[in-house]
């Protein structure tokens, strides 16, 4: 399945959460790569239901009495408008401020730099 969306600025929280060691280790275990500390946000025209694609669920954890929620991850391939691509993953935290129209992607590299992406650029996600 192919999904198209536009690159948008995030809330600035992806870098913090992906950088937490328990999340980083879990993402490496589930995806096969150590994620860059940050996410790429892609805004879709319609709501996206990740559960239709059998994502892998992961549990939350606690650090110094602070609870961090689990979520779901799905391996995908991301393409820029020139056809360049990279394997990455959609991450859907159980607790998020994003709408169901916004996808958060992680990869072993800084996706904006690797694919020379700017806000409003159209990208294709292949599941």
From Swiss-Prot:
Pathway: Cofactor biosynthesis; FMN biosynthesis; FMN from riboflavin (CTP route): step 1/1. Pfam families: CTP-dep_RFKase. It comes from the Archaea. Its cofactor is Mg(2+). InterPro entries: Archaeal_Riboflavin_Kinase, RibK_CTP-dep, Riboflavin_kinase_archaeal, Riboflavin_kinase_CTP-dep, Riboflavin_kinase_dom_sf. Catalyzes the CTP-dependent phosphorylation of riboflavin (vitamin B2) to form flavin mononucleotide (FMN). This is Riboflavin kinase.
């Amino acid at each position: 399945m192919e999904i198209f969306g536009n690159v948008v600025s995030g809330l600035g929280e992806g870098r913090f959460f992906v950088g937490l060691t328990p999340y980083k280790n879990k993402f490496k275990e589930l995806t096969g790569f150590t994620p860059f500390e940050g996410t790429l946000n892609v805004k879709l025209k319609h709501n996206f239901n990740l559960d239709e694609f059998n994502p892998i669920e992961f549990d939350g954890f606690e650090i110094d009495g602070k609870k961090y929620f689990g979520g779901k991850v799905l391996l995908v391939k991301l393409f820029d408008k020139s056809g360049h691509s990279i394997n990455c993953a959609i991450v859907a935290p159980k607790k998020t401020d994003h709408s169901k129209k916004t996808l958060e992607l992680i990869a072993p590299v800084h996706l904006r730099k690797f694919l020379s992406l700017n806000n409003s650029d159209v990208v294709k996600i292949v599941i």
